[in-house]
Amino acid sequence: MTAKKLENNSNHAVTAEEVKILTDLLDESTRHLVGDEEFAKIKGLVKIAASSDHSQLESQIACLSNQEMIIVARYFATLPLLINITEDVDLATEVNLLNNTDKDYLGKLESTVDLVAEKDNAAEILSHVNVVPVLTAHPTQVQRKTILELTNKIHDQLRRHRDVKASTINRKEWTNQLRRYIEIIMQTDIIREKKLKVSNEIKNVMVYYPGSLIPAITKLTARYKELAREKGLNVDGATPITMGMWIGGDRDGNPYVTAETLRLSATIQSEVIFEYYVKALNDLYRTVSVSTSYVQPTPEVAELAKLSADNSPFRENEPYRRAFYYLESRLAHTEMELLDVFSKEAVVKKEAALKAPVYKDAYEFKKDLEAIKRSLIQNHDRAVTGGHFDALLEAIDVFGFHLATIDMRQDSSVNEACVAELLKSARICDNYSDLDEEEKIQILLSELNNDPRSLHSSNSPKSELLQRELKIYHTARLLKDTLGENVIKQHIISHTESISDMLEQAIMLKEYGLLDSEKARVQVVPLFETVEDLQNSREIMKRYLSFDIVKRWVASKGNYQEIMLGYSDSNKDGGYLASCWNLYKAQTELTAIGEEQGIKITFMHGRGGTVGRGGGPSYEAITSQPFGSIKDRIRTTEQGEIIQNKYGNKDAAYYNLEMLVSAAVDRMVSKQKVSQDHIQDFTASMDGIVEDSNRVYRELVFDNPHFHDYFFQATPIKEVSSLNIGSRPAARKKITELSGLRAIPWVFSWSQSRVMFPGWYGVGSAFKHFIDADPNNLKELQEMYQGWPFFHSLLSNVDMVLSKSNMEIAEKYADLCEDEATRSVFDIIKKEWELTKEVILQIEGHSKLLEDNPSLERSLDYRLPYFNVLNYVQLEMIKRGRQEKLSGIYESIIHITINGVASGLRNSG
């Protein structure tokens, strides 16, 4: 029997009860805040929204004053937020329940290990699996940290309600706690008044580690190894999950990311993991009170105890406690020394710590702990070494002293400018940027192969750009020398279009010894983003990997070469189908090149939260990758509101990480459901379908003279761009140019206007054309849907996006257009939407959208009426703002509605 998605097991009755409790408390808090008269207007809107009478909703909202708009916006923005919490609690409860039973669900670790155990090389497979979620700070997390903390408190209260019998909880006290948090939310600024700095983004994402990610990852890693041992497989060195980080190192298009932010990111991360280790040692110190009156420690532990500064007479017979004290002193001294290297402030040094020697690395720290564990086991205290003790050992393997690996990223054009300046300064080439590709390659290879010296010198004049870039590489070298090799492992090149783009990056790394002619301490990782670049990636990588120097770099990295794939720009460039298909083909071709050259090509997937940016259910996203494309390792970006949704509490974090690992392993070992001949037939069909889709998409986006104005007039792009939700600018160029607009605000704006354009446009016409060409083609598409994971996932995502779109509301945004010619673009969009819905249901064999996703259907039924209200408030305020100059209250209301719609959709950018 096929395992079901865990979300489909949800307890709808309890969730509905909790939604009612929270809604009643919100009503009560709002009435006290605004009075009976104003509250009656809000409840009137609730009633109209539930009836789906959009015309009445629009007319009622148009009658509200600006001051009334604030209250209405706050109320309806808070409702979907509270619904989200109840659903998150339901998922967390279900995860906890099923992990303590024998019941199966899609992605459960036990089933995954059972599947692998049948293979002859099972131990090798499980030992090398490594899935890396990379946390990023793209501007899609619209919730303030303050609001997130309050919603987490409500989450905890609801968990209490579920974890104990309802009859045993103090209902009055419990309800008062919930009431208190909701009242505070209603009186707290829901949006940021100041734009975030990079330092804020670093600190914001760190909150997910102590209470969520660290316990979830250590638990999952321990469970992974335990399940393998039960099958007779030794995978003790496995790290199925490690974490990545872009914040502080991703300077592509963000002038605020500097050497200082890179240093700050590494330092804060290090502080977080040291704090965890110290707390864990304190816990062990308190609990492991084993006395020499009963058992004797090994000589190793006796020596650790002897070195301890814990000379209390009460600890005389407790060697383990004294040993833990010594380890904590060594750890404290180690952290002090690291902070001394990076901190500009004086570090307060404790005398006890100074007497203990510094750990040279995390492995040395682990060796001391393992000595204590061996002693306890020798004395038959095996139970003592489980739980927190084993969790600490797992944490050291996963997090070291660095916590997460920081990626560096820069645009290829910046690298070229810097290399051109370096070559000119070193009197090697005065006109590097004017050379053709072949000439560039020869100069770069000569420098990399033959001259170990840096091109720059300390006293040579440098542009501001080059100075800033060199400081970053210098800091990266310092971080690796201090915190270990894993703190920074790769440098990604945005807009990689040529071999020289990668060799230029190598030159920059060489300047501070991060790469030489024999090895690469930091790997050069190309990022292929546009449809054209994806199509060219095969030939670029084939030649790049043929260079002897590159082969040596790859060999120094364990024979792995990572390639990053960009989902956002390829979608904006060619539409959803063209993006998905070219990404799929690129992976297939690049994997084959790696196999030809004896290299394991691994992929980093630059996904966003929305389908238009590569988002969608994680399990399906990974299991729909081409067969053979996952070689042990896979990395994927997690950003914005997706981080909160997936990792906001330890149960949800465990489940989502478990899904990632299970999906990766499943794709590595499962067999294709359809024959290779069928896949080849499907591939040929897809080539033609995608060509049609790309043509339809580009005809509207790039060839229609009115599309540009439509986008800027019929979506809240200007309002979205002014949101204080990230440190990075919304556009590379002027905000009035589509070409310079970043993919994130592009997608975000279409989400707000409920068109969801990037997730489906061009799909309907392409499939319709294919079906009309041959009566048998519909059957082929249905076979593709049933037997090809890639195609099934693609259609399911389109189905989901269509269900979240709303053409009635989208048409109201179209009415914002200043002339009929511009507004006519909506007629094209609506016609394509209707066609896409019709064809998708035909291929799926369904009678309605979300027919095979009942949990999402119920979720949208809860929330859609409420954030429909927010859309009409947003529309009215945009109209008022464009007709007359309004005070700051206008922007505040708009931003509250943007926040609420994003919360309701749950994957807005």
Curated annotation (Swiss-Prot):
A GO CC term? cytosol
A Pfam family annotated for this UniProt entry: PEPcase
Query: Gene3D superfamilies, from UniProt?
Result: Phosphoenolpyruvate/pyruvate domain (1.20.1440.90)
Catalytic activity reported:
oxaloacetate + phosphate = phosphoenolpyruvate + hydrogencarbonate
Q: Which UniProt keywords apply?
A: Carbon dioxide fixation, Lyase, Magnesium
Please list the residues that make up the active site. Answer: H138, K572
GO BP annotation list: carbon fixation; oxaloacetate metabolic process; tricarboxylic acid cycle
Under Gene Ontology molecular function, one entry of this record is: phosphoenolpyruvate carboxylase activity
What cofactors does this protein use? Answer: Mg(2+)
Asked whether the keyword Lyase is assigned, the reply is yes
- Signal peptide residue numbers: none
The record's similarity note reads: Belongs to the PEPCase type 1 family.
- What PANTHER family does the record point to? PHOSPHOENOLPYRUVATE CARBOXYLASE (PTHR30523:SF6)
Q: Which NCBIfam families does this entry report, sorted A to Z?
A: PRK00009.1
Any idea what this protein is called? Phosphoenolpyruvate carboxylase
Give the organism, scientific name. Lactobacillus delbrueckii subsp. bulgaricus (strain ATCC 11842 / DSM 20081 / BCRC 10696 / JCM 1002 / NBRC 13953 / NCIMB 11778 / NCTC 12712 / WDCM 00102 / Lb 14)
* Top-level taxonomy: Bacteria, Bacillati, Bacillota, Bacilli, Lactobacillales
The protein's gene is named ppc
